[in-house]
Amino acid sequence: MTANDALTAAPGPETGTSDRRRWMALYVLCCGMLMIVLDATIVNVALPSIKNDLGFSQSNLAWVVNAYLIAFGGLLLLAGRIGDLIGRRRIFLIGLAVFTGASLLCAVSQSQGMLIGARFVQGVGGALASAVILGMIVMMFPEPRQRAKAIGVYSFVASAGATIGLLLGGALT
């Protein structure tokens, strides 16, 4: 086979590979979102155990939830803009790494302050990661029919994650 034959040959499985890669990327994005949604709902169910284990007062216990929500809600729009400027993939990966590291800190927390601080950092990571997911899906799936399927899968995972988190939180506590 000459160089010209290779150039004029029928296209190979590139389109199938590209399509497969897009759906694998969607799988990764959905796993990241599932992690974020699971965490939010598991913590709510686990609050009584957290209160007993770390000796929280009722008023201080609210900060376990509030620290996360303040960071997440406060940074969501900014995180989306940062993703537009320096790259959504980069921001997603940074956010996921920050979120995962903060989750580990939450798991090993021995004090109220450490848990509240780790929850704040978790909110930062969650905002970074989740702010760019839909933008990435829109860019990866430009064809309307495929985009609708991808957003449907993403929406299902996010919704199911909330339900699974409540059940899992109850089972773990």
For every predicted segment, state its role:
Residues 2-173:
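Transmembrane-helix bundle of Major Facilitator Superfamily
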